[in-house]
């Protein structure tokens, strides 16, 4: 009797395994398709510049405000380049961070510290650390290229009155500060609305919100506020953008290590 029961059990197990594998594959494919559609919102922008305000908000509600200038450059076939330069307050004036995002290779980042008058390369294993006391990490300041993650589609749900795709993405970089990220992308424009970041112990570390989107040149979407709430320490950081301009004629020369020192 036992022999007769083995074969149907094996068949049922194989059917279940096949169904599970197919389901996972379809989920991964759908998650990737959604991520690619979202990424296309930035195709062809060439370059952009903006003025930024960074607010550091303590658990008690105390606020420290910093002013920056930010510019970025589209690099066909690779990740984008960006340069952020602090203008105030005095203790961070002239500090600059240069980022070269790459589609599959580790990103390159350099930090210019005017007090030391030198450019410091940020090692890949240190990019999960906080950026100048904010709740943003060096990793957060680099562009999130599609190719750097594995994806799974989770579900569709309503968020802030918008129907959103909810996907999971897992960083492929072994030095990432995150084990996974849950991303809400609206189904109308495929804009990222919210990200839950999970730390290396798989606890919910931070919640990132993308607010006040505007479209430029009828083609390029820009959030005018990005909020990073730390769920573990109660602190928050807010980036606000103004004077956003596209197609300024920026070139690679504007994003070199020498440009870090010139940007003071």
PLM regions: where:
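Bacterial N-terminal signal peptides that target proteins for export
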Residues: 2-13
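Bacterial N-terminal signal peptides
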Residues: 12-23
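Bacterial Sec-dependent signal peptides at the C-terminal "C-region" and cleavage site
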Residues: 22-30
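Long, terminal "pre-/pro-" and other extracytoplasmic accessory regions
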Residues: 29, 147-156
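N-terminal mature ectodomain segment of secretory-pathway/periplasmic proteins
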Residues: 30-115
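Gly/Pro-enriched, hydrophobic low-complexity segments
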Residues: 36, 98, 108, 112, ...
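Short amphipathic beta-strand and strand-loop transition segments with alternating hydrophobic
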Residues: 71-73, 152-158, 212-213
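Short acidic/glycine-enriched loop/turn segments that link adjacent beta-strands
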Residues: 78, 160-163
């Amino acid at each position: 009797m036992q022999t007769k029961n083995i074969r149907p059990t094996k068949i049922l197990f194989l059917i279940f395994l096949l169904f599970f594998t197919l389901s996972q594959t379809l989920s991964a494919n759908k998650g990737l398709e959604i991520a690619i559609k979202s990424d296309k919102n930035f195709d062809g922008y060439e370059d952009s510049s903006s003025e930024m305000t960074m607010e550091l908000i303590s658990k008690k509600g105390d606020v420290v405000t910093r002013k920056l200038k930010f510019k970025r450059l589209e690099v066909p076939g690779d990740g984008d380049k960006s340069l952020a330069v602090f203008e105030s307050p005095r203790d961070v004036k002239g500090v600059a961070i240069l980022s070269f995002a790459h589609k599959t290779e580790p990103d390159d980042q350099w930090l210019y510290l005017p007090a030391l008058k030198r450019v410091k390369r940020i090692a890949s294993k240190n990019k999960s650390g906080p950026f100048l006391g904010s709740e943003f990490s060096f990793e957060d300041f680099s562009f999130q290229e599609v190719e750097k993650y594995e994806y799974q589609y989770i579900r569709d749900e309503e968020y802030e009155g918008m129907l959103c795709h909810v996907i999971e993405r897992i960083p492929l970089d072994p030095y990432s500060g995150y084990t996974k990220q849950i991303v809400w992308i609206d189904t109308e424009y495929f804009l990222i609305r919210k990200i839950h970041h999970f730390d290396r112990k798989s606890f919910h570390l931070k919640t990132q919100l993308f607010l006040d989107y505007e479209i430029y040149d009828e083609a390029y979407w820009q959030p005018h506020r990005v909020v990073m709430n730390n769920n573990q320490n109660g602190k928050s950081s807010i980036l606000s953008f103004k004077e956003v301009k596209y197609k300024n004629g920026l070139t690679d020369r504007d994003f070199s290590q020498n440009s870090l020192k010139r940007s003071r």
